[in-house]
Amino acid sequence: MSLHKSRYTLKILILFVSFLSSQNAAAHGGVAFEDDLCVINIDFLQAHFTVFQPETRESDEFCEDIPDVARSVFVMEYLHSLLPEMAIDFRIIRDINEVGRYATLDDVLAIDDLEAATVYYEPPRIEPGGFYTASYEFDAEGTYIGVVTADHPTEDRYY
């Protein structure tokens, strides 16, 4: 469950916040693709990241602030043809160092006990259908950092 520290690594950090108050909800709107905050770049790879809370928000889509402490379904739609061949893992950690929305890989690596900060971990898996999904039920409000790691299918590289 370690982040790959010894090799050339690039990780994409997705920050999201879970609040009980719906005043902080930021639903995904119909923005242009190039302005879409839900599009994440993993080096040269792109994916569209969306969070749903079906029990409390029906079909509303979120990509940063998650309004409710409830079950959250994370969907990453692959926008690059290489991603369906890559082993992808997903981790949610508490923002124990309080770095907030601008967390970096260095901030994550600075956590002394990543295992203790991790509230959810989905081991690497290949999703050839073009979508990666995971579900986690938050039990406390707070700031959480999502970390996605992609393993190149033929080269010794991680993204």
Regions inferred by a protein language model and the residue ranges of each:
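N-terminal export/targeting leaders of redox proteins
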Residues: S2, A27-H28
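Sec-dependent N-terminal signal peptides of Gram-positive bacterial secreted proteins and lipoproteins
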Residues: I12-F19
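N-terminal signal peptide c-region/cleavage motif recognized by signal peptidases
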Residues: S22-N24
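Contiguous segments within soluble domain cores/interaction surfaces
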Residues: H28-T133, D139-E141, T149-Y159
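Bacterial N-terminal signal peptides that target proteins for export
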Residues: S2-I12
